[in-house]
């Protein structure tokens, strides 16, 4: 019984990883805490203000781009500090650098046709367009990579089981 439940749980983890999608448009940011705080400071945003902005209850406003310019500039600041560059030297969307699939590239391009000229609003729109297109920053090269990611967890779980219990995936 325990064996079956554990196998189902691990299978759900693998499926979740392979289907991973951000719950908020900005969940993919990998910047350091210092970068995050610096961007907030530069844009005169408190932690409390950011938490309200990033709250799931505010998602509708975020997706409709119905947010203050300082929040858009904060997102621009954070995106500029990301290791994967989404903009070219002219500050325009760079779908190749973003590693967008052909399908998401078409969606992002179409969405960006109505992008504002103001730089913070432009970058904010890009992030929203990427999110709406399903562009994911979480990419696995292969199924083997998922197995490698979960192998340690499986080994730990197996070590905790009795000799006659096994984990089959």
From Swiss-Prot:
SUPFAM superfamilies found in the cross-reference section: Insect pheromone/odorant-binding proteins
Family under the similarity heading: Belongs to the PBP/GOBP family.
Signal peptide: 1-20
InterPro entries per record: PBP_GOBP_sf
A molecular-function term among this protein's GO annotations: odorant binding
Gene Ontology BP term (one): response to odorant
Keyword set, alphabetical order: Disulfide bond, Olfaction, Sensory transduction, Signal, Transport
Cystine connections: 39-77, 73-120, 111-129
Residue ranges of the TM segments: none
Gene symbol of the encoding locus: Obp57a
Function of the protein: Present in the aqueous fluid surrounding olfactory sensory dendrites and are thought to aid in the capture and transport of hydrophobic odorants into and through this fluid.
GO cellular component assignments: extracellular region
Domain of life of the source: Eukaryota
Protein name: General odorant-binding protein 57a
Organism, scientific name: Drosophila melanogaster (Fruit fly)
């Amino acid at each position: 019984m325990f064996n079956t439940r554990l196998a189902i749980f691990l299978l759900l983890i693998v499926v979740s990883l392979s289907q991973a999608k951000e719950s908020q448009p900005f969940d993919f940011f990998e910047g350091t805490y210092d970068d995050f705080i610096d961007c907030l400071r530069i844009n005169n945003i408190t932690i409390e203000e950011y938490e309200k902005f990033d709250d799931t209850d505010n998602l509708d406003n975020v997706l409709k781009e119905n947010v203050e310019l300082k929040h858009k500039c904060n997102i621009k600041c954070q995106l500029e500090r990301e290791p994967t560059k989404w903009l070219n030297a002219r500050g325009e969307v760079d779908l190749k650098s973003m590693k967008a699939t052909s399908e998401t590239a078409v969606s992002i391009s179409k969405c960006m046709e109505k992008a504002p000229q103001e730089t913070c609003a432009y970058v904010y729109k890009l992030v929203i367009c990427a999110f709406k297109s399903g562009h994911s920053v979480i990419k696995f090269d292969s199924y083997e990579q998922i197995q490698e990611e979960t192998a340690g967890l499986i080994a730990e779980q197996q070590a905790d089981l009795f000799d006659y219990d096994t984990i089959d995936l």
